[in-house]
């Protein structure tokens, strides 16, 4: 970790400060706090009634009243309709307003793991300079604020740190992606909590997964939190907007990183450089230490982690129900097929008749595959993958009935079935009913689950991936064969027999280059001629 990441190195950290000669009534107003409690607990009418009773002017605008009402978080045990009047409001209730955040916390702050400029405390960063940009501009560039921000991002070499309440501009985000992927510049973004949903929606529209951008770290921050005696709290928003570049340049102002500020709204941007950037450096590290990671349920998913192609292969019980059980147990409607249109097929009706008449002979048509014929429909394709089939005799030696938990292959539903060591063949044979039917019928009822996997699509995806893998290997092998054949042709050309006239001319040339031969032989050594031609 760079030395500049430690807040203890900041100037004035943990040093006694002089008492300010400011009026405490201007910093804290008890009547305002009580009025806010009435607003959160009783609504706007209760708030106005309290102001009228205390003869206070309304210190909140209508827009602020709506924002405070929406931002207020009331504990679940406290009613927002004023049913908590029985609680003691004299201050004896243990509430959050009397707590404090310790100066030294036991929670480890997040680390700037991708790196940070190694500026030591009080190091000289240059003369403070400022350049102002206004938009719309009447000079050479109309959108001067946006162009200035993009130019600073393109010229960044060490780090890009952004604090903003809006990040939905596609051009700005494209420049940030290019900086962290191509130039390997660390990018840190602190977003206001209310704008996270818009940012994630933009990433989803661009098919961008934040987990794949290793050099970009996005976290959320909030404003100050106002606690009340009832346990309710009001959390403010972040209105800070600045971008720190390489630790010695800062862009700040009213400009926001969205399309409306880039094209429609009037805004300003101030580019600062020099020693003044040390204050922004410290402020960003403080905000980063207070930030939180993106919510797990709203984070942009990673394609590798959330791929459902192989989900049906995970945590599956060994073994599948044999074909004998399909004829001896009553089939469930949800387990018959993966398509609802096949609920009443002739095969299924025939199976139901066999169950109703236990004294009848077994069905002469036997399933030769343990997967069942329900799997044939979703696997019908141009080149379907071949599944292993089992063909065995129907002679029964021993019967071992064990209740196990298995998985239905055709519908991917888990149930409890009885594994019976019975082998059947395709030839029609008569068999007498035995105690096996009674033992199988005593198994627990089958609990069907909804189907969520399409086998045909899964196998097609696997086939495409294999073809792509094999084609890449084949192209590499062809390239290697081409290189080897080319080298062999060069070796054959050097070993061709020459006519006597050409042979004498070649000897004369070799004698003329006799001084260079010693040098070449010293360099080449004992290498073969084919290696020398390379």
From Swiss-Prot:
Top-rank lineage group of the source organism: Eukaryota
Similarity annotation: Belongs to the FAM83 family.
Record-level Gene Ontology MF annotations: protein kinase binding
Any matching Pfam family: SACK1
Biased composition (Basic and acidic residues): 350-362
Family annotation (InterPro entries): FAM83, SACK1
SUPFAM superfamilies the record matches: Phospholipase D/nuclease
The protein's name: Protein FAM83D
Main location per the UniProt record: cytoplasm
Entry-linked PANTHER family: PROTEIN FAM83A-RELATED
Region annotation Disordered: where it falls in the sequence: 320-372, 501-534
Keywords: Cell cycle, Cell division, Cytoplasm, Cytoskeleton, Mitosis
Subcellular location: Cytoplasm; Cytoplasm, Cytoskeleton, Spindle; Cytoplasm, Cytoskeleton, Spindle pole
Function (record text): May regulate cell proliferation, growth, migration and epithelial to mesenchymal transition. May also be important for proper chromosome congression and alignment during mitosis.
Source species: Danio rerio
GO biological process, one term: signal transduction
Transport in keyword set: no
